[in-house]
Amino acid sequence: GHVPCGKDGRKCGYHADCCNCCLSGICKPSTSWTGCSTSTFLLTR
């Protein structure tokens, strides 16, 4: 399933769609959050 993005409420299948995916698999709006990285591609589809 898709994961809702806290930044704007849109949903993303890949982190690049609208947010960054953390190692936990939860989407966060900024890489400044602990554990977040734009280089971490976690598929949520």
Curated annotation (Swiss-Prot):
UniProt keyword annotations, A-Z: D-amino acid, Disulfide bond, Ion channel impairing toxin, Neurotoxin, Secreted, Toxin, Voltage-gated sodium channel impairing toxin
Alphabetically, the GO molecular function entries are: sodium channel regulator activity; toxin activity
Instruction: State the disulfide connectivity.
Output: 5-19, 12-22, 18-27, 21-36
Q: In which tissues is it expressed?
A: Expressed by the venom duct.
List localization entries: Secreted
- Which superkingdom does the taxonomy of this entry point to? Eukaryota
State whether keyword Disulfide bond applies: yes
Modification D-leucine, positions:
43
- Which positions are cleaved off as the propeptide during maturation? 45
Q: Which GO terms describe its cellular component?
A: extracellular region
Q: What does the record's free text say on domains?
A: The cysteine framework is XI (C-C-CC-CC-C-C).
Q: What does this protein do?
A: Iota-conotoxins bind to voltage-gated sodium channels (Nav) and act as agonists by shifting the voltage-dependence of activation to more hyperpolarized levels. Produces general excitatory symptoms.
Name the protein family: Belongs to the conotoxin I1 superfamily.
- Please identify the protein, giving its name as recorded: Iota-conotoxin-like R11.13
